[in-house]
Structure formats: structure tokens, C-alpha cells
């Protein structure tokens, strides 16, 4: 497990598996690196390609349907969004990557913001690399995984929109090969915001990760 080298708020033992019974609230947004806040709380991060379903998953996990804005238009999330769960845990929603229909300068700004945060956050405990189960693992996903490993960030693969895929054998094989090339072992979880598949496992993985790292 990774120790990011900063003491976090740990006045008493917290049962993180029960935190998600509480609604989260939006507390900050960052468009530039100098706007990134430091809450000195554990951070669980969601990153993935544009329109992968990040907002829907975050809303489902955080028990708040209107928390993160859901859109069918790729590139809707244009800043890093921070959501606070009863001053015990921060959920972080990063802008989607790989969206081409924006000016190059804007795309470079998003990528720079994402990269800076992933490299420099002292409170980051776990990164959820979200991948559309209908599309499989793409080159952009591989680059993000390599960035995470280069910066010693713990991550797990989350296949989203699992209700739309019936045959998972090829996906499992693809994920295993992908992780083997990285020489990395992690959770692979299928989730759906529609039928709630995988939500319990996802929350449990957060609690387990934080427990081991603190």
C-alpha cells in the first residue's frame, strides 16, 4: 500500500463502509492548479474517458442523484470537483480525458490539471480508473494507468455500464492482459448506476484501501 507522506485527520476510528449512508455535498471546484484545495481528508478519485459514466456512478455511491451533473454530452465536466461526505472523506471527480471536440488549448489545460493533481495530491488514497465496458480498454486508459504507476498511486479498474454487456469473458481477459503488461495487481469491478451492480463492492474497496493506508 502507498503512503503519500502526509498526516491526515484521524482523531478517532471511522467506519468508512458506513459513510455512504450520508449524502455528500459539493465543496469546491478547481479549473487551475492553484485552486486545488487541501482538506487534509482521505480522497477517493474517479477518472476516465469523457462520457464513461463518472457522474452517474458518483451520484449513486454518494446517495445524491443531483450531486454531479449528468450529461450525454462528452466533456461536460470541465474542472476538478470535490465532494465532502460529513467531513470524513472527499470524493474527487476529474475531467474526462480523450474528448476531441474542444480547442487544443482547452484539452491541454484539462490534461495538465489532471496530471498535476494525480502527481501532487497528498491526500489521494485510491484512484478508480473508469472504463466503458462496451468499449474496452483504450490507449488513453493505458496512458493514465502508466501515469498512476509512475507516481506510485494505487488504482483499480471499474468497468461501467455493466448492465449493457452480457459476455464479460473477453473483458476479463483484456483486463488480465493489461494488468500483466503493467506488472500490477488490482481489483476489477463491474458497476452499473441503473441496477446498482457492484456498488457494495466499490464502497467496500474504498473502506479497505483507507484502512490499510492510514
From Swiss-Prot:
Domain of life: Bacteria
Gene Ontology MF terms: GTP binding; metal ion binding
InterPro entries tied to this protein: G_ENGB_dom, GTP-bd, GTP-bd_ribosome_bio_YsxC, P-loop_NTPase
Residues where Mg(2+) binds: 55, 77
Gene3D superfamilies: P-loop containing nucleotide triphosphate hydrolases
GO biological process: division septum assembly
Binding site for GTP: 48-55, 75-79, 93-96, 160-163, 191-193
Family: Belongs to the TRAFAC class TrmE-Era-EngA-EngB-Septin-like GTPase superfamily. EngB GTPase family.
UniProt name for this protein: Probable GTP-binding protein EngB
UniProt lineage: Bacteria, Pseudomonadati, Pseudomonadota, Alphaproteobacteria, Rickettsiales
